[in-house]
Amino acid sequence: MNDDNTPQPYLIITCGLTGTGKSTIMNEVAEKKGFMILTSDKIRKELVGISPEVHKYEEFDKGIYSKEFTERTYIHMIEEGEKLLLQGISVILDACFPKKWQREKAFEVAKEANARFLCIEFTCSEEEAKYRLTERFDSKEGVSDGRWEIYVGQKQVFEEVDEFKPELHIVVDTSSSKEESVNIIIKRLEQ
């Protein structure tokens, strides 16, 4: 736990559909703020023993993207985040967090660890998301397996973020420049 001279660590969760810029923006925020970042894309693959760089394009809600395996992935990621918080380390949990129970579980962990909490919801137009996902798929770069079909599936099951007070939740439209989105988040974290 923290003594009076140690600043409270932050637990930040991202949420939003694939292709909205969560990882791109939060990798930069993590670098600027010195926060650790845990990504569901890497953790999911590590749990099945494959390299995060290996792409596993499965249908929405199938294989390592099934409801059961997704639940296991989120629980593991949140537990790993809790370990860092208890060491006084600020951490970003980079994932879609489409379900209220996932977001609420992370919030409870932050409270128990006496950490500050922020849910950052990422949005952009469907056209922009589709463009980004097509570019990502064509380039085969990064660890994400997100594609347009996944975006469409996530959109159908994404539960509105209405469980947090305004001071615990911000929405960032990533249609503007990356720098602008990063600056909005940094400014919010420094309040």
Predicted feature residues:
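Conserved nucleotide-binding/hydrolysis micro-motifs of P-loop NTPases
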Residues: 42-45, 97-98, 123-130, 176-178
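Small-molecule kinase domains that catalyze NTP-dependent phosphoryl transfer to phosphate-bearing small molecules
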Residues: 138-184
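Conserved phosphate-donor/acceptor-positioning beta-strand/loop module used by diverse small-molecule
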Residues: 113-133
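Hydrophobic anchor at the beta1->P-loop junction of P-loop NTPases
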Residues: 14
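Conserved lysine of the Walker
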Residues: 22
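The conserved Walker
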Residues: 17-18
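Extreme N-terminal, non-catalytic leader segments
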Residues: 1-11
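Conserved substrate/cofactor phosphate-moiety recognition/catalytic segment
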Residues: 27-89
